[in-house]
Amino acid sequence: MLHAEQLTCIVDDRPLFAALTLSLAAGELLQVAGDNGAGKTSLLRILCGLARPESGVVSWQGQPLAKVRESFHRQLLWLGHKPGVNAALTADENLRFFFPSSRLQQRESALAAVGLAGYEDLPLSQLSAGQQRRVALTRLWLTDAPLWILDEPFTALDATAMETLTRRLEQHARQGGSAILTTHQPLRPLRCPLRTLRLGGDAGGGQ
């Protein structure tokens, strides 16, 4: 599905990781771990095609990303460490922006799944940081993208929301989807394949 070969990333003359190779198959989850500054977000951005590595190649379905970028991005859901929502819009308006062909019932069901039933018409500026994060994560209930790349998706979530997100990740994997995520929180045992890639120490990475 997704493959990265011999990736090297250097930021401000400092190597974050070198000669890093990874593969992600359908139905698999990959947790990227490491201390702050180890290069977790940089790696995710490279895998998304949002940044270039110093060296190395990222491939999607056996083709270099540079050759299939448009097709790849149609099959990718990327959530950065910031919510990426418009605080001036309502929860429903934000979801309509991301999914213009979605139906109101679908959006309401997705918001209910993350514990935000009845919040459809509230401006996000009136919601807490955790609630805004949940609005952003609602996209996981509306997308049909097979590949999710998520940077710190558990940030600002309470225990109930964390459990809801964990169950959604398991469901996605059971349906043949894949996900790469970073998180500072230890994941509870999952009912799907989970591997860990740790960055740091020797500026490299290992699985």
Label the predicted regions:
Residues 48:
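Helix-to-loop junction immediately C-terminal to a conserved catalytic motif
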Residues 53-72:
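Conserved ABC transporter NBD signature motif
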Residues 82, 87-103:
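Q-loop/switch helix immediately C-terminal to the Walker
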Residues 105-119:
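Conserved ABC ATPase "signature" region
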Residues 123-128:
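Conserved ABC ATPase signature
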Residues 137, 176:
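Hydrophobic anchor residue at the start of the ABC signature
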Residues 148-152:
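Catalytic Walker B motif of ABC-type/P-loop ATPase nucleotide-binding domains
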